[in-house]
Swiss-Prot record:
Enzyme class: transferase
Keywords in alphabetical order: Acyltransferase, Cytoplasm, Lipid A biosynthesis, Lipid biosynthesis, Lipid metabolism, Repeat, Transferase
Name this polypeptide is given: Acyl-[acyl-carrier-protein]--UDP-N-acetylglucosamine O-acyltransferase
CDD domains to which the protein is assigned, alphabetical: LbH_UDP-GlcNAc_AT (cd03351)
Organism per entry: Trichlorobacter lovleyi (strain ATCC BAA-1151 / DSM 17278 / SZ) (Geobacter lovleyi)
NCBIfam families: lipid_A_lpxA, PRK05289.1
Matching SUPFAM superfamilies: Trimeric LpxA-like enzymes (SSF51161)
GO molecular function, one term: acyl-[acyl-carrier-protein]-UDP-N-acetylglucosamine O-acyltransferase activity
Length: 261
């Protein structure tokens, strides 16, 4: 363990072996820092924050600060990160609220680039990339292996499906289905642009899965059918494709409605 002499570590904080704490960093009460995690200069780890192993918190980042919610009155709520995350300079993650999940959760191997923001009660999966200044409002869910371009802004309670990609500057007010690309494209809010084909191929999705998703996309968004009729048609025509089943289940579970082209 290496703690710079100018760092401030609260006596109740728990630091595992191999943790490095840089100059002027602050680690507040009840924080838990896992093995091999590094905290950069001037970074702040707020109280009730749990970091797993081998995370890299760069200088000036803030993880676990109080939520920007006027209803919050200092109740015990948590921020929890898994392993292998990279939080770049000036990125911010806020803890949960008692009116939400009482915790903000991030999984493993995510990258938050500079000035990106994860608000209270968000759930971020694994392998997510948030480019510079991408912003999640409160209660947002981002599933695994999503890519958010720079300056993306996502409304409260929106869900972004796994393997989706959002182009830079996209404004998102409705759920984005898994496997899709969406951009604002000069419009005020996001529009679907098709499947994230390059991303799916890079991730090793089979030709059969991609073919099934293409067919499902055309039926859902290009056949001018009611959503329930489109889903029924797809289920009768595409059997045994897990990716298509995942897509349909996501759409049926959506609470905010689905972004369309």
């Amino acid at each position: 363990m290496s703690i710079h002499a100018s760092a401030i570590v609260h006596p109740s904080a728990q630091l595992a072996e191999g943790v490095e704490v840089g100059p002027y960093a602050i680690i507040e009460e009840h924080a838990i820092i896992g093995k091999g995690t590094s905290i950069g200069a001037h970074a702040v780890i707020g109280k009730w924050t749990e970091l797993g192993e081998n995370n890299q918190i760069y200088h000036m980042a803030s993880v676990g600060a109080a939520p920007q919610d006027l209803k919050y009155k200092g109740e015990e709520c948590w921020t929890r990160l898994g392993n292998g995350n990279v939080i770049r300079e000036f990125a911010t993650i806020h803890r949960g609220t008692v009116t939400g999940h009482a915790e903000t959760v991030m999984g493993n191997n995510n990258l938050m680039m500079a000035y990106s923001h994860v608000a209270h009660d968000c759930t971020v999966g694994n392998g997510v990339v948030m480019a510079n200044a991408a912003t999640l409002a409160g209660h947002v869910t981002v599933q695994d292996n999503v890519i958010l371009g720079g300056l993306v802004a996502i409304h409260q309670f929106v869900t972004i499906g796994a393997y989706a990609m959002l182009g830079g500057g996209t404004l998102v007010g409705m759920d984005i289905p898994p496997y899709m690309i969406a951009t604002s494209g000069g419009k005020r809010e996001a529009q679907l642009r098709g499947l994230n084909l390059i991303g799916l191929k890079r991730r090793g999705f089979s030709d059969e899965a991609i073919s099934g998703l293409k067919k499902a996309y055309k039926t859902l968004f290009m056949a001018h059918l009611k959503q329930a009729d489109a889903i029924a048609k797809i289920r009768s025509e595409i059997v045994g494709c897990a990716e298509v089943d995942t897509l349909l289940a996501f759409i049926e579970a959506s609470q905010r409605g689905i972004c369309r082209g």
